[in-house]
Design a protein with these regions (language model features):
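Active-site-proximal alpha-helix that buttresses catalytic centers in soluble enzyme cores
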Residues: 1-279
Length: 279
């Protein structure tokens, strides 16, 4: 069977945690492989630090974006779909696009799939996927999601999504970021105020206040941020900060890539990119 000249390049930040890689990035890639058997699938990671760690520690070599583009040239690929597993179209995604487009003269076409959160429909799908996954939590428990955050203006999406959880019927779900806003301190204050406002609506409903938080990463992979900044046992971790504020804290180390509905969104974004070529 002749090799296809069409390829899908799946670009991820990467992770040094093997279990997290298998549970998220590889499952996304495998779902794309299954959905588009007529395409050859390539992988690239963008974190130089993680690539270096894997090479030195595990003797695992994963190409960066430029290396993957050069490999596709060598393999005779002419049509490229690039699907990032980034959450937002922020700085990391823009750098990736620039690197890819520096090779545009070597291919007949290059089309980009959108990051995970790229519109209202995506946002609503994500809200329901997470809301349904954690619907077992009782009324005294809040789900606190840790996003990465970015200095890019696109960071406003985190606050918008936090509000969308409430608007779509998930008042106990809160979204913050580790490197931008909303910060963990802002979330602690918001959750504290939630208990006060809930009680003020009904003076007999003292049981509406939040007593416990379940922490989970709003990141594709449950990597270093999730293990250390979120669930770590040091005083500045989110788990410790919530415990110091008087809440019981439980951490779930499961990245968004482990959720089927999230992976389905990436497959949908690949299909949209393919459709854009034919239009």
């Amino acid at each position: 069977m002749e090799h296809s000249h069409k390829a899908i390049l799946v670009v991820s930040f990467g992770t040094s945690y093997e279990d997290a890689r298998k549970a998220t990035i590889e499952r996304i890639e495998n779902d794309i492989i299954a959905a588009f058997p007529e395409y050859r699938i390539y992988r690239a990671w963008t974190s130089r630090m993680i690539l270096s760690i894997l090479k030195k520690r595990d003797q695992i070599i994963i190409p960066n974006v430029c290396e993957a583009m050069e490999q596709m040239i060598d393999d005779g690929i002419t049509e490229v779909i690039v699907q990032p597993t980034h959450i937002l179209d922020g700085i990391e995604n823009h750098i990736m696009k620039d690197e890819v487009l520096s090779y545009k003269n070597y291919f007949q076409s290059i089309s980009f799939g959108s990051p995970l959160l790229s519109g209202q429909k995506d946002a609503e799908t994500i809200v329901h996927a997470i809301g349904k996954r954690f619907e077992y939590l009782d009324k005294n428990t809040a789900l606190v999601l840790m996003g990465h955050g970015t200095p890019h203006q696109v960071n406003a999406v985190y606050e918008e999504l936090d509000q969308l959880f409430k608007d779509m019927g998930y008042p106990h779900i809160f979204l913050g970021t580790v490197e931008a806003s909303p910060s963990v301190q802002e979330l602690i204050q918001e959750i504290s105020n939630y208990g006060i406002s809930a009680q003020s609506c009904d003076s007999t409903s003292n049981d509406l206040s939040i007593e416990k938080v379940v922490l989970a990463p709003f990141m594709i992979v449950a990597g270093d941020h999730a293990h250390n900044d979120m669930a770590g046992d040091h005083p500045e971790s989110w788990a410790s900060r919530f415990q110091s504020a008087g809440y019981e804290a439980e951490s779930i180390l499961k990245g968004l890539g482990a959720y089927q509905k999230i992976r389905e969104l990436f497959v949908e974004h690949v299909q949209n990119a393919i459709n854009n070529i034919s239009e």
